[in-house]
Amino acid sequence: MSELKNDRYLRALAKQPVDVTPVWMMRQAGRYLPEYRATRAQAGDFMSLCRNAELACEVTLQPLRRYPLDAAILFSDILTIPDAMGLGLYFETGEGPKFERPISSLSDVKKIPKLDPNDDLGYVMNAVSTIRRELKGEVPLIGFSGSPWTLATYMVEGGSSKVFGKIKKMAFAEPQTLHLLLDKLADSVIDYLNAQIKAGAQSLMVFDSWGGVLSPRDYNEFSLQYMHKIVDGLIREYDGRRVPVTLFTKNGGQWIEAIAATGCDAIGLDWTINISDAKRRVGDKVALQGNMDPSMLHGTPERIRQEVATILEDFGTGNGHVFNLGHGITPDVDPENAGVFINAVHEFSAKYHK
């Protein structure tokens, strides 16, 4: 495989010196780009796009053709694992993902098959290897998965939720059922991410989108301990390089010390925590990723540049910062504003790396 031409992102995750702060965007391959919308229309629907390695590669590379990004992220979905477990994933227009056969009992959990990622999720591995080849060493490729808790919320709720009533009922009325599900999911995530590494992923991210709906005690019990298990089970060196892992819990700012203690390389931050506060609290244990509010991309170019400058100033000098949004870029953002954001990070950060 080609030698990396731009390893800023991996160096920042290792808290090594860089010339400028690296930047990428969650959901950088997405509906805000007209070329993405055209490719998705060609695929027919979202999961067909995910399952076609050439088209998944195409949409992964699209933002890199537009912007000087420092990393590519696999185009896929966090729900590939429960889909492969036979829950019948489908998408309803305007309502997001749903499952035909949600999990509601211990017997449902016991029936969940053990996955072989190279077989049951072979289309993801094909996409990873295709993207890695087509990147030609320009930037590193990030692989990812949802966290066990976040995957379980969709599997038990049967789709997206605002109140999480079903999974919280299971957590408190049948905790042993939920723990069995979370344990199975943790094992599946470990196998899935390790397969992505072998297919070509050079860094990993675990998205705990819904960890923030839990109380501190319940977060430790139902989310964090399973992410800790994942970190312990991952391949940490491959092809002569460390494979860093970033954990991202949305609304998880109150728990960053505990997240840092898992042994992860970096913590993803949303916009509800000040990055200077996060840096003070975790010290040099981990790198930090984030954390501009994605809604800021609706601001004027001047306002976007001002926010980038403020966050860089808040982080200050020192290594270990990957600039990102605090969550995914939204479909209604002007692509020009995304370019303003990315260019501002490189322009304003150089003075912090002299």
Swiss-Prot record:
Chain residues that bind substrate: 27-31, 77, 154, 209, 327
Predominant subcellular localization, coarse grouping: cytoplasm
Recorded GO CC terms: cytosol
GO molecular function, one term: uroporphyrinogen decarboxylase activity
Annotated InterPro entries: UROD/MetE-like_sf, Uroporphyrinogen_deCO2ase_HemE, Uroporphyrinogen_deCOase
Statement: the UniProt record of this protein carries the keyword Cytoplasm: yes
Localization in the cell: Cytoplasm
Keyword set, alphabetical order: Cytoplasm, Decarboxylase, Lyase, Porphyrin biosynthesis
NCBIfam families: hemE (TIGR01464)
Gene name of this polypeptide: hemE
Known function: Catalyzes the decarboxylation of four acetate groups of uroporphyrinogen-III to yield coproporphyrinogen-III.
GO biological process: protoporphyrinogen IX biosynthetic process from glutamate
Record pathway: Porphyrin-containing compound metabolism; protoporphyrin-IX biosynthesis; coproporphyrinogen-III from 5-aminolevulinate: step 4/4
Protein name: Uroporphyrinogen decarboxylase
Claim: Cytoplasm is one of the keywords in the record: yes
Catalytic reaction(s) noted: uroporphyrinogen III + 4 H(+) = coproporphyrinogen III + 4 CO2
Lineage: Bacteria, Pseudomonadati, Pseudomonadota, Gammaproteobacteria, Alteromonadales
Site (Transition state stabilizer): 77
Signal sequence extent: none
Family: Belongs to the uroporphyrinogen decarboxylase family.
Superkingdom of this protein's organism: Bacteria
This enzyme's EC code(s): 4.1.1.37
Oligomer and partners: Homodimer.
